[in-house]
């Protein structure tokens, strides 16, 4: 008979008697919880916020001077004309956020570290607010179409995006669709953000080169979406582009900002040209906003230029910097996860306005003022939040969009 083997008490031996214990630090959030433009970190870009009521918000703009000039009274009188005055007409664009929590979890997860590592009701409310704010950030950079990516190729259920950076628009579990009408709906099961690929349950409708991908729930209203920076400052200017009822093609620079095609130029040369051309039109950009990839290229290219580090570190490690431009001024430089690649916005901060109906992010309340809603059909509680807003650039001529 074999000799007995010594047995030691170790963790596996007494695993049934060990408790699970969590600190009060809660769940660490690895989602995009930083907002460059407005809501979560106004220290970066403190956009003006204007609460309004009624069905629409109106802001007039003069984009052409009056006539009446001549070397004689006769010619001055003959050329007399009124100034060209239009008005932006802004209507609210709605974005809803809803999260459910079962009754048993609501009462089990109370935040007591001896039993649960988070307070379920507080977590769902706080996280819903952050998620909605991040979605607004994404929309403020958009073109109002609801499109979040296009197809480059498909292999099995893996979709390679035309622009790898668009992978930031996707989340595991997200429902996506192929058309404005939402004809085919599928779910995201995996995202490779470095490779720019998205794995889905089925690729029906998103299996051909250049097929558009929309987030379900936004596609049906894609023609009435938030008028974000891509819509306000288009880089393709071959046909009419209407923003807040104004056709920008009447005077592209005055009504859509200066477009600088800096393809082939170094990043520093590109931003310098963009800022200077905006100044030539009477503008005075205060901020440059770009993708983090373009920000990295600019910082590497600007090693020999005068650059300053200011402000607090961003969450992912980059710092806000200021860059010197030829007229001796300084312009802040910011990165955003949702800014389109190879596109830089030279913006005059005081001129951008976030018009919102109600508070910026509203909790939809019950009659008694509570914000948790109960559904006896499913035995769940839910929190419902709403944002009604849009972006207005009052005098686009003060800004520039730069294509790298």
Task: Label each PLM-derived region with a short phrase.
Residues 1-70, 79-404:
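Core alpha/beta structural scaffold of self-assembling particle/tube/pore-forming proteins
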